[in-house]
């Protein structure tokens, strides 16, 4: 009986891994086609199939796209757009994750009068379409003198991502035993000591989830990038769109 159960368990595990591998191959296939096609010259693309390997490592298309491809009226390549995305994404991700951790810590473990109402308003922000806030955000950026700038994009992404990061951390910290906090308070630990010495060390899983979530959301965003950027602050998503429409 135990041998039969072990065999069924091994079969189910093998089936699970095969299913996951097939799913991964399905989603990675477009990336593979994109990479191998970018390494082919025009004749290879016309004569060979999409999945065939290139005859040689030809990086001319990469150099052209990076240095001198035309994105509208400018022909400076995608490099400026890439660095704009880097300077925009890293601060926005780090600040929104840190701020969300503090919000989640307060709303789950240091509840106060009105904390549930405040969390409900933040939760509403998770489901609000970004198109609804384009005009108000544009007005606020104008008042702050941050229109068409990297700093303005950082602020927009920070505020847009804060409801989600708060939700992640609040739900994660809600599972922390209250006795642990009570014991720390009895030992004289205050708000910041509990957060830095107890909560932060146990937050690695949710921190990684939030960092990945925020990075992908901000790096891949097009709406805010095209609405709030200027000529010198457009992110890579806008640059790629301009490149595709130019060529």
Describe every region a protein language model picked out.
Residues 3-6, 12-247:
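A structural signal for multi-pass alpha-helical bundles of membrane permease subunits
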